[in-house]
Amino acid sequence: MITLIGEKLARKGSMFLFCGPAEKCRDCRFQPTCIAPLEEGRVYHINEVKDRYQRCPIHLGERVRVVDVEKANIEVLIDSKRAFEGSVISFEFPDCDVECSMRDLCFPEGVMEGDRCRIVKNLGKPGKQCPAGNELRRVLLRPLDKK
């Protein structure tokens, strides 16, 4: 999908988390191209940076670049019984209140409860045991578009 991003951030292969539009964006003439295609709370991967520029008051008078993006693959921890490459799952956050070093992978940014996701790659066991006793696997998920 095509969107706009600050010139300093527009690098092929980089990723960004869309946190929602600034107040000034709501009435901007570029809003349909810039923010309308993006979902708040999603992580996007920049596939291509185009040679097109626009001025943007949000980026301190700097320019924004036209970029081609897609939803990024997200590294997560899931139950080992569901970790089959190529399968489509409904993502669920674990029922866990334990604060541990792996919590960011169990509750990752960019994927939401109930999202349909494809398991792109099974990365194997995490480096540590789950303190809550869950049998987990590290996987790369790709959130799928809603149908």
UniProtKB/Swiss-Prot annotation:
Q: Which domain of life is it from?
A: Archaea
The family note in this entry says: Belongs to the UPF0179 family.
What is the protein's name according to its record? Answer: UPF0179 protein MTH_609
Which species?
Methanothermobacter thermautotrophicus (strain ATCC 29096 / DSM 1053 / JCM 10044 / NBRC 100330 / Delta H) (Methanobacterium thermoautotrophicum)
High-level lineage: Archaea, Methanobacteriati, Methanobacteriota, Methanomada group, Methanobacteria
